[in-house]
């Protein structure tokens, strides 16, 4: 017997409301785009798109000719006005495509503005007094206390406390994230809300410079800068337009020599059909839509250039922890060395971790607790904490009695112990190798000049990583894993995950060296990062994807920011970049291929009366010369709105080699660009023939 499916009425209403709001927003965007289509007819706006500007000039000329009597004209009076209207709609359709793409960005900006409500901040003055001021009066360096239920007034970094923060206004993710002082996860964003506990933050941006302000200005696209590839393609298309313009302008000289004249409206129609109006009308929309697709992935691109660069990436540099593995390295077991005991290792491991707020440090405390190993917490709390640094690759505590306790990478701690005059137990490297071969991370525990044992930190490779790296390999992209682990651990993880290369015991300067080495080979490099120590490498990379949960320095150095703080998203970003480039290339191919059919429609129509042999080119058997010209023009106009969904969504992309992609696109959009207009123009000709 089947059980009835019960759905709460409230849930149904919520879903219905969301669907209704989405439909309303889409309708509003379309209405706004239609209005903007006419507003963009302003020549000052149109001249930014030379191809469509030529079409607009053609509309003006034919429109004026419609009201000027001409006894020498060989075409009826209605022909000029019909041509002018078709040209007007051609321009309007192109404007609509651009306005529609811009409208989606503005809709996202409007939703972001909702998070910029008037909020007040509890500012801590130098004398300790707390004063409530408006968020707009905050300046960089101000100290602010944010309590449970309060909105974070501006961008900042946590310097005291720990709290759960709801970032759904920025990321769309409802689950709160933990923000705490110290480390790489101290950054908070204005417009987010503290849902538990209390934190003290230092403001890192002045009014108008916050993260949300930057997001709004970027997604609105009001001052969108064209990318280098877009400029280059636009230059080529403009050059083609200029060449065809010269051809059409000089054509009457030759026709006069042959003893017949061509009407101005026919010449304008010929020019419009020859120039690449399809891609000219969709070029801006493709670029804006590419930025929009990245934004929908919750990635903020600082420029269209960054998105395009992602499509040309040859090498991706990935951190092991948190990207390839889950990053939750936990203490798995303790391994004593020499004649030491587990209790001794556990005692000193715990003392070195009492003040260590990292997940690894906390896991050591939890592990020691589960094993009921006793240690003196008080002496650790009274000591001076030595934080982990990428340069030293170890952390610990200096106790008040002068004892120095350290835990860290095998090589670093061994070197430190030797510098203290100590000796190294014979089984240290043996046990470290055992942990590494298991795919774990060994941390050596030492006190002054004596090594007590190792902590076995265990991490797990994320499922599906091998398949994703194989897809990148098919795309011709090399993957390089950078990790602070020793070579054995790095090799084990690299083999399991399926990366092409790895760099073990990697320091921040090593990442920069890897990036420069790849760039010296003429390759474009992408990398992810979240810490201040990643900032130089993020700035050096062609595509630097910083995590929103990371430090301000990392986000300022990168040219993309992932609002979900998911490092593996760099793979999706590369796919979106390739999709953008492929869409532009495919529609350019389609647009130029269209011209072949238009030649067979318009050329015979223009010259058949003077040169009867030209009738042989009328392979579509179009009804009449006037019908042929109008059919070609109508197809030229109608194809633009028909291709808007493809320009906005992007063409389907599957991981494959560049040669395979080129062959596939030439077959679909090259051959398709030849066949479709033959069919379309013929169908339109049949319909037009019924009226003339």
Swiss-Prot record:
Entries under Gene3D superfamilies matching the protein: Calcium-transporting ATPase, cytoplasmic domain N (3.40.1110.10), Calcium-transporting ATPase, cytoplasmic transduction domain A (2.70.150.10), HAD superfamily/HAD-like (3.40.50.1000)
UniProt keyword Transmembrane helix present: yes
GO MF entries: ATP binding; ATP hydrolysis activity; magnesium ion binding; P-type potassium transmembrane transporter activity
Transmembrane segments: 50-70, 77-97, 240-260, 266-286, 600-620, 628-648, 672-692
Class of the enzyme per the UniProt entry, highest EC level: translocase
SUPFAM superfamilies reported in the protein's UniProt record: Calcium ATPase, transduction domain A, Calcium ATPase, transmembrane domain M, HAD-like
Protein name per UniProt: Potassium-transporting ATPase ATP-binding subunit
